[in-house]
A protein has these predicted regions:
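Conserved short beta-strand edge segments in small beta-sheet-based binding/regulatory domains
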Residues: 76-94
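Short S/T/G/P-rich N-terminal loop/turn motif that feeds into the first structured element of a domain
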Residues: 1-52, 59-69, 89-113
Length: 113
């Protein structure tokens, strides 16, 4: 199953701007290295003048979970909320069918369709 790691972030914590930049660069390098090894997509960064920044990395669920369990990623993800306001992340299933087919099966099983 394909999944996407979706990371959102706001402005750096005042006084920690340089550390926030270092953390973002290290996170970008982490995912670019994994992409070069064929384990995921390259990170895509989305910027907005009025909304939080967003980064998306896609890959197979097993590969992404293994990458996210590494000590290197754990250090980066644990430090990020200390450096960046409104930091959050989530792992989402990709595509219409994976979730919809499960929902459809549950609806039929319950006799609601």
């Amino acid at each position: 199953m394909k999944v996407a790691l979706v990371v959102t972030s706001g402005q750096p914590v005042v006084g920690r701007e340089a550390q926030a930049i270092d953390n973002a660069r290290a996170a970008d390098a982490f995912w670019r290295n994994a992409a070069a090894e064929g384990k995921c997509s390259e990170p895509e960064w989305f910027w907005s003048s009025t909304a939080p920044a967003m980064t998306i990395v896609k890959g197979e669920a097993e590969d992404m979970q293994m990458l996210m369990a590494t000590p290197e990623w754990q250090r980066l993800i644990m430090a990020a909320p200390l450096l960046i306001q409104n930091f959050s992340w989530e792992l989402r299933m990709c595509g219409f069918d994976p979730l919809f087919s499960q929902f459809e099966a549950a609806v039929k099983e319950m006799g609601l369709a």
